[in-house]
Amino acid sequence: SNNIKILKNTLVTTYNFSDHLIALEDKNVGKPQDNEKPELVLHKIRTKHTILANGHIERFITFRNNDLPGVMLAASFEKYLNRYGVVPDESPVIFTNNSSTYSLLKSLTDLGHKPKAYVDIRDQKSIEKETVELLEKFNIPFYPKSEIEGCEGQKEVKKVSIRTKKNQISKIKTSMLCVSGGFNPDIHLFTQSK
């Protein structure tokens, strides 16, 4: 259609009232890095209707020393694995409260890697059947109704402490912990417009 313009490599930074948007276009993407001047274009856009498709943001779960190198959001780990072909760790511990980590578990086992443990806050009845079957098939230590109490290590993750449903502490040596606390819709631009 003649009234549609596609702006690639463009970030909408502001969504003001009456469908007035500010966007920053980077014209350097795909050009040699030796450009002396970045070519950025600021667009002021006025629309009759705006459709936002911003996606979602994965939530973290709070625990002791969750800022150590080696603690990573599960979706980020999976993106490295499936999009870039990079395996950040061959046997991470996975900590979750939702079903989104099944695809990470499947991707790891399909590549021949075995997580050291799968820790889920939910009780076993609430966890999807295919997740439990995959854990059993590959004999992956499974901790339902449990949580990560904290990570140990000075400059990186060396161990994780798991508080089990019986209130006992299990420690597992690992260098990587993948965490998923579920997802929130990314509504930041939408809230600016109101």
Describe the residue ranges of each PLM region.
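Residues forming the flavin
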Residues: 1-194
